[in-house]
A protein has these predicted regions:
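Basic, amphipathic alpha-helical segments enriched in Lys/Arg and hydrophobic/aromatic residues
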Residues: 38, 42
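A short, surface-exposed loop/turn module that caps and links secondary-structure elements
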Residues: 43-66
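Arg/Lys-rich, positively charged N-terminal/basic patches that mediate binding to nucleic acids
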Residues: 1-36
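Enriched for short, Lys/Arg-rich terminal
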Residues: 59, 66-98
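Residues that recognize and position ribonucleotide moieties
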Residues: 3-4, 51, 87
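Flexible, active-site-adjacent loop/turn segments at secondary-structure boundaries
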Residues: 1, 8-11, 45, 53-56, ...
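Generic alpha-helix structural propensity
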Residues: 26-33, 50-53, 69
């Protein structure tokens, strides 16, 4: 899927292996792994197939957003933008789940 980063720091974190996100090396590596899966996906159905990502819709004020688990503590918040076949993933933030 095509990706748009809302935060340039996340774009740098994905592209530059020496960049750090401030949440630790394991989170940085996990983020890059999730981004590889997103880029390889043809649509959101492929994301649901990866059970470990726990791809899910958020609720309340954030019902237009989705999340993917980086690890037990951290999640990647995204938005699905546009219509198929030109749907894009907007990468919003890495958040502490708890």
């Amino acid at each position: 899927m095509d990706v748009e980063h809302d935060d340039s720091a996340l774009q740098d974190l994905e592209a530059d292996r020496s960049a750090t996100g401030g949440s630790g090396d394991a989170v940085d590596r996990g983020f890059r792994k999730v981004m590889q899966i997103i880029r390889a996906a043809t649509d959101e159905r492929d994301l649901y197939k990866h059970k470990s990502l726990r791809f899910e819709k958020l609720k309340g004020k954030r019902k237009h957003q989705r999340s993917l688990r980086i690890n037990k503590q951290w999640r990647l918040v995204i938005e699905l933008r546009g219509e198929a076949p030109n749907k894009k993933v907007g990468v919003i933030a890495i958040e502490d789940y708890h």
